[in-house]
Amino acid sequence: MSGRLLVLEGIDGCGKTTQLRHLANWLPRSGLMPEGARLHLTREPGGTALGMALRKLVLHPPGDASPEPLAELLLYAADRAQHVAQLIRPALEQGHWVLSDRFSGSTLAYQGYGRELDLDLIQQLEQIATAGLVPDLTFWLELSVEESLVRRDARSNDRIEAEGVDFLTRVATGFAVLARERSWVPLQADQQVESVSSALESQLKHHFGPLQESMR
């Protein structure tokens, strides 16, 4: 596949959505993408029509029907399988770029470390759902739990975001471990928005600028 899959990861309130919007404007004009390539913006859960229905079930379940941890994990896996098969892989095969707000790393961090489900099981589901697809570059927007809670209190929260401090601390630990093990690019998310955007741009130029030069 000639396209590129880029992912933004991090705990609640780290600014992923803000930076995704910035890159949506910057990347197509950056000169890094091949001629004719389009940028597809997406998210997990909810990157497809089926994914939107699953997102609602996971984050805003009806009444007292909150899914059990294992059921929650399987719903995320179903969302990812549909997402990869319907949107991500076809776009990459056509040479387009895909920028996703969360991917499989979030499941390991939230359901593995946060919910304390079996990591081996989650990794097996990851392989099945993605059919072995691995992001070309993942950015970890690193934010302290304390700052995450401050930012979270300033907005409405879904079921996952409303979890307590202990849960969020485990999730943050998970992201730190994954970033190290999977060679993610860490960025300090407690800076001004413009500083984070500039750091993202610099890293993208570093990783993909030489590639574009070699293709000319």
Swiss-Prot record:
Pfam families: Thymidylate_kin. Its EC number is 2.7.4.9. Keywords: ATP-binding, Kinase, Nucleotide biosynthesis, Nucleotide-binding, Transferase. The keyword ATP-binding applies. One of its GO terms (molecular function) is ATP binding. SUPFAM superfamilies: P-loop containing nucleoside triphosphate hydrolases. GO terms for biological process: dTDP biosynthetic process; dTTP biosynthetic process; dUDP biosynthetic process. GO terms for cellular component: cytosol. PROSITE patterns: THYMIDYLATE_KINASE. It catalyses: dTMP + ATP = dTDP + ADP. ATP binds at G10, I11, D12, G13, C14, G15, K16, T17. HAMAP family: Thymidylate_kinase. Phosphorylation of dTMP to form dTDP in both de novo and salvage pathways of dTTP synthesis. Belongs to the thymidylate kinase family. This is Thymidylate kinase.
